[in-house]
Design a protein with these regions (language model features):
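Residue(s) in the substrate-gating loop at a strand-loop-helix junction
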Residues: 566
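Substrate-binding pocket helix/loop in short-chain dehydrogenase/reductase
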Residues: 521-522, 526-531, 642
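Short C-terminal tail/terminal secondary-structure segment
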Residues: 673-689
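Short, small/polar-rich loop/turn modules that mediate ligand/substrate recognition or access, typified
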Residues: 511, 598, 603, 672-674
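Alpha-helical segment proximal to the catalytic Tyr-Lys
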Residues: 550, 595-596, 670
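Glycine-rich flexible loops
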Residues: 1-430, 442
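Active-site helix of classical SDR
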Residues: 545, 582
Length: 689
């Protein structure tokens, strides 16, 4: 049952009508079983002073594209009711006319565009109105016998409105239906949702919760868990087995769904998902259609349901079915588009947003991790609706044509237009070794600033987590992900890539940056020192690149690797034979990989920096003292020494290297591979030739 979250003490602090509306809206949006993410809308009617100081009656309503759970006052739109109410006398009004008219009614031009369902709120005479999409209510509204069952629950207290797309016509239908039923306490919108109201904000919220719980109690009394979704056909595999399977198939899925534009993936194996994908009736039930019009833009009409018998030994069989399934889904979506398109429509990516695998769970796709999560969150709601509707009778959905018209509805697409424009690294995942250090952390910030998701791999997990947290605080949840990895440990490297595959679906950019440095005269260089440099800078770079190469080949959508070499890759560093030799190995390894990677669209380039002291764990250790001794100067004189030996007389900083990495990772260098670029201020001895 839905719990009331109303707090009298907190509510009493909200003194204005708008403040009370924000509070109520946030409570409603905090429970996704009550309101879809980005869905629903709320309003309040109040009196404010206009710019002339006169009292005017205003309705504040949710602005288009915002989410009730996180809305602030600035996300609501104020409209003059004196201008809106006469519209109910009209016989018809197009969407375009409605949007233009409401624009003239706004009390502040800086407010967002008003919700699509603004007139629904305005035409009802109540001070506070909620429109929500509760699981229990939509279960009732999507049951083939929903109207009859509603009479059992609510008697004559409800109004049933047949499905009509939101806008003027639906708003007028609702108002007239409510006016004609003096006992009406709620509106049930077929295949859509719920409308409730009250004379105070608290009364409105309490009514919303009460009505939902009446429906939920009715449904739960009829749920038979054993026969749910036709009964269990495929029990869930063990959690560790599910994760292992997903880590191996995610790159295949990512490649299959990313042929036109790359996608970020996420994995979900929550209990309700596993119950649904394991049901005997679920393959057919999942193809009936969307559970709510609000879902369509993010989930498409139906998911891709994979016909596969769970078997941990049949990974290759699952991969084949996934590739075939995605291809068939795209073809069907193309046909759906062609059959229903209107003039001027441009087809979205045809790949599925939701992929269901028996025994394993759900894979969601999107242009970002956050949007893949939106698809997943909405499909959780769809599962809940199908659970309820099938317990009541038969689950029914919109026609294919109406589903299309909602999915491609200009008023829905307007919400998508509010998102920031995509930038160079949008839809891409970067894997950065040495992610906690100066170059690694600066590179992560640089790539994320242009849309990337980044993985920070480092032995210093605490440091990597700190950088990731700072990035996520600024750019949003899970834009950065930290993990502990020893580049010299083959199993650790393989495990890290498996982790990333589960987290995001795969990788596009590898920054091979983990490092160390030692200094000794050649005749004093021990085998231990030699092996240490070769293990980290040679074997480590080899393992990171090899596993990335495998993953990129599996994806089949190309990729870019950037090796962080050194001036010493091409320059004989004094008292640094082990380090210099290992750095030379890195540079040549990169060229070798570039020679093999071309046919797969995998580019490999190398940056040769010099003397990056800022934020460097290497330079803050013994290496600083050793290099100073090699040059016969004091450690605190090193930065100035290095600056003066450059032809440009400059110091080099992590941000300079990050800029070079961004160039090699970007489309600006899409025809460049096997290249070395110095970023050292100009050290003549290291000029490549």
């Amino acid at each position: 049952m839905v719990q009331s979250l109303w707090n009298v003490s907190q509510a009493s602090e909200k003194t204005t009508g708008l403040e009370q509306l924000v509070y109520r809206s946030n409570l409603i949006g905090s429970d996704r079983s009550v309101c879809n993410i980005y869905g629903g809308n709320t309003s309040t009617k109040t009196t404010v002073k206009d710019f002339r100081g006169r009292d005017v009656e205003v309705m504040y309503v949710k602005g288009s594209g915002s989410d009730l759970g996180s809305m602030e006052a600035k996300h609501f739109t104020g409209l003059g009711l004196e201008d809106i109410r006469p519209l109910i006398e009209r016989e018809s009004m197009s969407d375009e006319e409605m949007v233009e008219y409401l624009g003239h009614c706004m009390i502040d031009a800086k407010h967002p565009r008003a919700s699509i369902e603004t007139l629904l709120h305005a035409f009802l005479p109540y001070k506070h109105v909620d429109h929500t999409h509760p699981d229990a209510i939509i279960s009732l509204c999507c049951a083939h016998n929903g109207k009859e069952l509603a009479k059992e629950i609510y008697g004559d207290r409800f109004v049933w409105v047949p499905y009509v797309r939101p806008g003027f016509t639906l708003s007028k239908m609702i108002a007239e239906s409510v006016f004609s039923n003096p006992n009406a306490e709620l509106v049930l919108m077929e295949k859509h949702g719920l409308v409730t109201w009250g004379e105070t904000s608290e009364e409105c919220y309490a009514q919303t919760i009460k009505i939902i719980n009446e429906a939920e109690a009715f449904i739960e009394a009829r749920v038979n868990e054993e026969s749910l979704f036709g009964g269990v056909k495929h029990p869930a595999l063990a959690a560790d087995v599910r994760r292992q399977i997903v880590s191996r198939v995610m790159p295949t899925i990512r490649g299959a769904v990313s042929d036109s534009k790359k996608m970020i993936l996420s994995f979900d194996d929550q209990e309700d998902v596993l119950a649904f994908v394991g049901g005997a009736d679920s393959p057919e039930l999942s193809q009936v259609g969307a559970a709510c019009p609000d879902h369509l833009v993010h989930t498409k009409v139906v998911p891709l349901f994979i016909d596969w018998t769970p078997d941990a030994e049949d990974i290759e069989g699952l991969k084949a079915k996934l590739v075939e399934g995605v291809a068939a889904y795209k073809e069907q979506y193309q046909q759906y588009f062609e059959s229903n398109k209107n003039e001027g429509d441009v087809m979205f990516e045809a790949a599925p947003r939701v992929i269901l695998i028996p025994g394993v769970g759900m894979i969601n796709t999107g242009k970002s991790w956050a949007l893949s999560q939106v698809s997943g969150a909405l499909y959780h709601r769809a599962i809940a609706v199908m659970r309820g509707a099938t317990s009541l009778g038969q689950f029914v959905s919109l026609s294919a044509n109406e589903s299309y018209n909602v999915e491609y509805w200009p008023l829905e697409l307007y919400k998508l237009s509010l998102a920031p424009a995509e930038t160079e690294f949008s839809r891409k995942v970067a894997f950065i070794t040495g992610g906690a250090g100066g170059i690694g952390s600066e590179t992560a910030r640089r790539l994320v600033s242009e849309g990337a998701h980044v993985v920070l791999a480092d032995l210093n997990l605490e440091g990597a987590q700190k950088v990731a947290q700072e990035i996520n605080d600024q750019y949003g949840a899970n834009r950065a992900y930290a993990l502990k990895m020893d580049v010299t440990d083959e199993e650790a490297v393989q495990s890290a890539y498996a982790d990333v595959a589960v987290q995001y679906g795969g990788v596009d950019i590898i920054v091979n940056n983990a490092g160390l440095a030692t200094s000794s005269p050649f005749d004093e260089t021990s085998l231990k020192e030699w092996n240490l440099n070769m293990n980290v800078l040679g074997t480590g770079y080899f393992l990171v690149a090899r596993e990335a190469f495998k993953l990129m080949k599996q994806q089949g959508i190309g990729g870019s690797m950037v090796f962080i070499g050194s001036k010493n890759s091409v320059y004989a560093g004094k008292s640094a034979s082990a380090y210099s030799s290992a750095k030379a190995l890195e540079a040549h390894l990169a060229r070798c990989i570039a020679a093999e990677g071309g046919e797969y669209g995998i580019r490999v380039n190398t940056i040769l920096p010099d003397a990056i002291l800022q934020g460097s764990a290497i330079w803050n250790g013994s290496w600083r003292n050793e290099r100073a001794a090699a040059y016969g100067i004091e450690p605190d004189q090193l930065e100035e020494y290095y600056r003066k030996r450059t032809t440009l007389l400059v110091n080099i900083y992590p941000r300079d290297i990050a800029e070079g990495i961004a160039f090699f990772a970007s489309s600006k260098s899409e025809k460049t591979t096997g290249c070395m670029m110095t970023i050292d201020g100009g050290v003549p001895a290291a000029f490549t030739r």
